[in-house]
Regions:
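Paired acidic/hydrophobic, glycine-rich loop segments that form the ligand-binding mouth/hinge
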Residues: 69-74, 91-93
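Beta->alpha turn/N-cap motifs
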Residues: 56, 73-78, 110-112
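Short helix-initiation/N-cap motifs at beta->coil->alpha
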Residues: 51-65
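Short, hydrophobic alpha-helical packing/hinge segments within bilobed ligand-binding/sensory domains
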Residues: 59-63, 77-80, 126, 139
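Extracytoplasmic/periplasmic solute-binding protein
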Residues: 1-25, 68
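Glycine-centered hinge/linker elements that transmit conformational signals in sensory
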Residues: 22-52, 95
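Extracytoplasmic/periplasmic substrate-recognition and gating elements
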Residues: 45, 83-146, 198
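Conserved C-terminal helix/tail region of periplasmic/extracytoplasmic solute-binding proteins
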Residues: 171-236
Length: 236
């Protein structure tokens, strides 16, 4: 669950195109993520004792049982929480990463989708299923069950537990998850947890330096393509 507060902070404290800018050589994570790293450390002062002992399921269960008043997680966790306590009354708000409310950004993104492969047989049958799934009535059922936000424009009713985020949704004050741009093999979640457990005075510098180093390691092919493109376009 380390990535949940990390993403919530990053969308408000770093530019949404940070990863692209790093690939282009215009910035580094040491510069772009310093404020994020420093503030996620501060969160530990408000956490339960030994928060590292909680897995995602453990944290959802603990919150459902009233063992914590707030849980830094996305709305996607609500079904898991309600499976333990169906009668729980949940509200939510956008993470206050900045001192000024108008500078805050809602963390929102799509990490699940349907697709039809080129070589798929019986495509018409598949399209019929997708058409059904994309009907307003079907989408509303999904929203009600999963406390989700629709990716389709229409007259949908959002779950009441998202009332605290309505203004951000209506105004489009949202940004994608930063970790959607991280290579899975980079294991950023483990890097963040290691950083949070590091009590040394230079923990932030060590973490950010490692982030830059690991990023180059796991994105070297993409970075090379970006560099080649820039050279061809005369940008460098």
């Amino acid at each position: 669950t380390c990535l949940a507060p990390w993403n919530a902070l990053a969308v408000g404290l770093a530019e949404s195109d940070t990863c692209s800018e790093v690939n282009a050589g215009n910035t580094t994570f040491t510069d772009a993520y310093r404020d994020v790293a420093e503030k996620i450390k501060v969160l530990l002062d408000y956490a339960e004792p030994n928060p590292y002992a909680y897995s995602y399921n453990d944290a959802c269960t603990a919150f459902a049982r009233g063992e914590s008043a707030m849980y830094v997680i996305g709305s996607y966790a609500v079904p898991q929480i309600q499976s333990v306590n169906p009668d729980i009354n949940i509200d939510s708000f956008t993470f206050p990463a900045n001192d000024k409310e108008e500078d805050n950004v809602l963390n929102s993104g799509v990490d699940l989708q349907f697709c039809v492969m080129k070589e798929t047989k019986n495509k018409e049958a598949v399209y019929e299923v997708l058409k059904f799934l994309y009907e307003d009535e079907t989408i509303q059922i999904y929203l009600d069950e999963q406390n989700a936000i629709p990716c389709k424009e229409g007259d949908f009713t959002l779950p009441s537990m998202l009332d605290g985020m309505q203004s951000y949704i209506q105004e489009g004050r949202m940004a994608d998850y930063q970790d959607h741009h991280y290579p899975s093999e980079m294991s950023v979640d483990a890097m963040i947890q290691t950083f949070l457990m590091d009590d040394s005075s230079n923990a932030v510098d060590t973490f950010l330096s490692r982030f830059d180093k690991e990023w180059k390691r796991y994105n070297r092919d993409l970075i090379a393509k970006v560099k080649k493109y820039q050279e061809e376009k005369g940008e460098q």
